[in-house]
Amino acid sequence: MKKVLAIILGGGAGTRLYPLTKLRAKPAVPVAGKYRLIDIPVSNCINSEIFKIYVLTQFNSASLNRHIARTYNFSGFSEGFVEVLAAQQTPENPNWFQGTADAVRQYLWMLQEWDVDEFLILSGDHLYRMDYRLFIQRHRETNADITLSVIPIDDRRASDFGLMKIDNSGRVIDFSEKPKGEALTKMRVDTTVLGLTPEQAASQPYIASMGIYVFKKDVLIKLLKEALERTDFGKEIIPDAAKDHNVQAYLFDDYWEDIGTIEAFYNANLALTQQPMPPFSFYDEEAPIYTRARYLPPTKLLDCHVTESIIGEGCILKNCRIQHSVLGVRSRIETGCMIEESLLMGADFYQASVERQCSIDKGDIPVGIGPDTIIRRAIIDKNARIGHDVKIINKDNVQEADRESQGFYIRSGIVVVLKNAVITDGTII
């Protein structure tokens, strides 16, 4: 894999994940209590022996830069690196990234200098575990110009993805990005060609692109240079290339989830607590997911009742009830709290005992969840200060609401408390 360069697309403004992307780039959003989204594709690369990795980003990249700099330091005796390339304006190109392909095009001058055979294009907001070596091996065996990683998909979600038709050799003969109505119906295929059983094929009659591509180096350079108006891989580059290039499909038959929306992000995190077998597990010694070593003390639970939950390191929980939830590092839950079906991202720092007591004496709210608070079906972002006897339960069953001045949003019925928000004593949401 020394001849492969990975390019992870950091995504746009992250509007579908807002407000989690208010102060951070999408790949820097915390996941599963201690990781960040960027750790997923980077770990997949490392486990696949791909060590040349660029991350392209445009918005709020400070925390992403910090995380990558602290986490992925390869030794000086290898060519390996993980580097963030932020959007920049130049005399030749005064514009920001206009799309996924344009992001790669603007850094082509740097990427084409590498002595590699393939570019591996990845997305920064997917949850999955994949050995890219098998993917690239298939690309080489079929002598493909481009290979797309694909999954079979059902009617309900089909219009959210790029869909394709393939022939018996696996070659892509038609491609349509997020079709609707009649255009969607035209993309139905017999997915038994992918090896599905007739029953599976009946329920999943579409072949969807995962947004993961391998390009021959010279093919990508040619496609990006010859038509500057093509700014997006899914909408323009791939459909046009399918007409006159050997574009192959590679079936990925394991768990994969696009967690680019609040609802999908929430569901994917809580699914990690499922018993006995969650759809995705971080407990895999063969292909671990890496992140920053924080050197935190073990979690302390004092008279707590915890069921079906994941609790990050360095947490302090006192006489509380935690059910079907994920708690991030340094979470602090006080006496009498009840946390149900919620994702708490934890905190970036500890408040010293003296400082906490001073805050309480002054009438301020310390970082963490105050006594006798109930949180149900919510996401609590980092460093939130939630007071005494607060109820975050979406009492009116609101589906969508923007209450930034009050420290929270509601998305798909899920209450999202902002990073650094203060929710005062007795508040009912």
From Swiss-Prot:
Gene3D superfamilies: Hexapeptide repeat proteins, Spore Coat Polysaccharide Biosynthesis Protein SpsA, Chain A
Inhibition and activation profile: Activated by 3-phosphoglycerate and inhibited by phosphate.
Catalytic activity entry: alpha-D-glucose 1-phosphate + ATP + H(+) = ADP-alpha-D-glucose + diphosphate
Keyword hit for Transferase: yes
Pathways involved: Glycan biosynthesis; glycogen biosynthesis
Biological process according to GO: glycogen biosynthetic process
Cellular component terms (Gene Ontology): carboxysome
Pfam families documented for this protein: LbH_GLGC, NTP_transferase
MF annotations from Gene Ontology: ATP binding; glucose-1-phosphate adenylyltransferase activity; structural constituent of carboxysome shell
Keywords linked to the UniProt accession: ATP-binding, Carbohydrate metabolism, Glycogen biosynthesis, Glycogen metabolism, Nucleotide-binding, Nucleotidyltransferase, Transferase
Enzyme superclass (EC): transferase
Record carries keyword Nucleotidyltransferase: yes
Positions annotated to bind alpha-D-glucose 1-phosphate: G162, E177, K178, S209
Enzyme Commission number, as recorded: 2.7.7.27
Subunit structure: Homotetramer.
Role according to the record: Involved in the biosynthesis of ADP-glucose, a building block required for the elongation reactions to produce glycogen. Catalyzes the reaction between ATP and alpha-D-glucose 1-phosphate (G1P) to produce pyrophosphate and ADP-Glc.
HAMAP family: GlgC
Protein family (similarity comment): Belongs to the bacterial/plant glucose-1-phosphate adenylyltransferase family.
PANTHER family: GLUCOSE-1-PHOSPHATE ADENYLYLTRANSFERASE LARGE SUBUNIT 1, CHLOROPLASTIC-RELATED (PTHR43523:SF12), GLUCOSE-1-PHOSPHATE ADENYLYLTRANSFERASE-RELATED (PTHR43523)
Protein's UniProt name: Glucose-1-phosphate adenylyltransferase
Species of provenance: Nostoc sp. (strain PCC 7120 / SAG 25.82 / UTEX 2576)
Taxon lineage: Bacteria, Bacillati, Cyanobacteriota, Cyanophyceae, Nostocales
